[in-house]
């Protein structure tokens, strides 16, 4: 109860109220033994700018649930956002060691390595993640994007394609089709990009971002009428 109340207050921007709910929650036996409430409280303090308190709360959560993949992931990604890259890598690596079958921790570590320019290390972790869960389309997408940013266009194409074929009709495939379409449009392969954007909206018609990206490409090609048609389809979806 206290956890739910705290989360609702936090989502409404009532930080002090949320903090008090979390504080009351951990005074109960159930709350003290709940990794989720410690994690939520840690995230609150982190967003409030109290780094020391956030770290203490993450640590208390791990004392309750040492293998909690959610805490290792949340703590590691938070440290990365603050710029404490080495600390983030250490936390994510520990989380991976304790949860060797979790692709999300591997993906987070892979993305961090890619952002730091160590593409070989990133590839190792991305590959491990796809072996663990070949159906995890977000991992294929993240890997493809990392290769694209590094200028490895053919590798990126291959990864987008592999990710799509995991399940072309799953809503997550729309992100792969969309990103792949943007890549092809920037490479000048407009016909292919159109087909990919069409596939993306067929999978996820509610995504305004995909429709507008497609319309913008048509505008850039000088086809204003087609761009208007696509925007109209977006508004009628």
What are these regions (language model features)?
Residues 1-237:
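Alpha-helical solenoid scaffolds in eukaryotic macromolecular assemblies
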């Amino acid at each position: 109860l206290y956890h739910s109340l705290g989360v609702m207050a936090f989502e409404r921007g009532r930080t002090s109220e949320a903090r008090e709910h979390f504080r009351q929650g951990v005074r109960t036996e159930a709350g003290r033994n709940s990794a989720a409430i410690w994690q939520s409280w840690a995230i609150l303090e982190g967003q409030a700018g109290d780094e020391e308190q956030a770290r203490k709360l993450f640590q208390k959560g791990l004392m309750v649930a040492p293998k909690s993949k959610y805490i290792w992931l949340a703590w590691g990604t938070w440290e990365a956002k603050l710029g404490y890259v080495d600390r983030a890598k250490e936390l994510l690596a520990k989380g991976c060691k304790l949860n060797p079958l979790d692709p999300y921790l591997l993906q987070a570590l892979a993305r961090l390595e890619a952002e730091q320019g160590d593409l070989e290390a990133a590839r190792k972790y991305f590959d491990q993640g796809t072996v663990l869960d070949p159906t995890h389309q977000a991992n294929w997408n993240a890997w493809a994007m990392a290769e694209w940013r590094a200028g490895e266009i053919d590798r990126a194409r291959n990864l987008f394609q592999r990710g799509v074929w995991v399940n072309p009709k799953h809503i997550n495939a729309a992100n792969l089709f969309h990103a792949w379409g943007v890549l092809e449009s920037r490479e000048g392969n407009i016909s292919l990009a159109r087909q990919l954007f069409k596939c993306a909206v067929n999978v996820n018609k509610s995504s305004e971002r995909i429709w507008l990206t497609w319309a913008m490409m048509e505008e850039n090609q000088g086809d204003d009428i087609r761009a208007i048609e696509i925007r109209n389809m977006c508004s009628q979806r």
